[in-house]
Amino acid sequence: MKPSIHSLTHQTMQEWVLEQGEKKFRADQIWEWLYRKRVQSFEEMTNLSKDLIAKLNDQFVVNPLKQRIVQESADGTVKYLFELPDGMLIETVLMRQHYGLSVCVTTQVGCNIGCTFCASGLIKKQRDLNNGEIVAQIMLVQKYFDERGQDERVSHIVVMGIGEPFDNYNNVLNFFRTINDDKGMAIGARHITVSTLGLAHKIRDFADEGVQVNLAVSLHAPNNELRSSIMKINRAFPIEKLFAAIEYYIETTNRRVTFEYIMLNEVNDGVEQALELAELLKNIKKLSYVNLISYNPVSEHDQYSRSPKERVLAFYDTLKKKGGNCVVRQEHGTDIDAACGQLRSNTMKRDRQKAVAAVNP
């Protein structure tokens, strides 16, 4: 199975062309064809020699993903189900924001973290995506608009799809390098956000990288007992260890951390929890920001329901009165398979049912 050409960073592209006996500037030409002109085949790279095109075809594919399903919401959200070369499925989501087009990418096939409210963890991790498969998600979303003649460009990226990005650390870093490169898509690092469920040691590593990509942490509870009950990762990285890493990140980078907090009715959404959260954040409140997120129900997790508006507002008001920076996040795609991993999970379920029906007509 040939890798995607998108697996090469600009530096490794330069190394590759030199290994082929070509001049270094050929890497810039290939890069421009891929990311500025966004061609779908090597044959379209008309300023390359036939010999170099043959070598590219022999060693790489341009697009490693196949589009299976596209769901479009009334609010402009678009959800894509892509098939990988090995037949596995991943999701990507485009969201229209007031500041531009934001794409949420997947970094793993399945997830081993096992959050009890999440559709992504219904299917255990099968493998990591390589950086080319992550880059290809952005390129196919951009292609979706290019083909419709819509003069719109992906401007922001959130690494919050299926999987734990910091469990696929090196591929995710190479994805940042490729998509941020000023000769390519040139998406600014500060327009990219990576979200972790709380791998404390990787947060420290990320602080030391010196990249300008934004950091978000999926917190979802203000104390160890509650967080461990809904996120098993808290047993390995309890809040004390997690916040020591977050404080190290802030001290090292002087950059703000966003905390994601999904609102689960009568589980973590009470005024008591809001007060606990305010206390937890009191030493870093100038460089912290809380996103209060409405829960998208998942049939397999029917013990949870979304918090009613009055509980969300009471939580928000309590946190604000304590000096916390917070916002109730805008919802997207509520009329389609909105929850992370839901489209993939539902499609796999239907595929299994069809397979059983074919065997037992």
Swiss-Prot record:
Any idea which positions bind S-adenosyl-L-methionine?
Answer: 163-164, 195, 218-220, 296
Q: Cellular component terms, GO, for this chain's entry? A: cytoplasm
Q: Where in the cell is it found?
A: Cytoplasm
- The active site is formed by 91, 340
Cofactor-binding details, from the entry: Binds 1 [4Fe-4S] cluster. The cluster is coordinated with 3 cysteines and an exchangeable S-adenosyl-L-methionine.
Q: Which cysteines are joined by disulfide bonds?
A: 104-340
Q: So where does [4Fe-4S] cluster get bound? A: 111, 115, 118
Q: What else does the entry mention about this protein?
A: Reaction proceeds by a ping-pong mechanism involving intermediate methylation of a conserved cysteine residue.
Q: Which family does it belong to?
A: Belongs to the radical SAM superfamily. RlmN family.
Database matches in HAMAP family: RNA_methyltr_RlmN (MF_01849)
Give the matching PANTHER family.
23S RRNA METHYLTRANSFERASE (PTHR30544), RADICAL SAM CORE DOMAIN-CONTAINING PROTEIN (PTHR30544:SF5)
Know the name of this protein?
Probable dual-specificity RNA methyltransferase RlmN
- Source organism: Streptococcus pneumoniae (strain Hungary19A-6)
Name of the gene encoding the protein in the UniProt record: rlmN
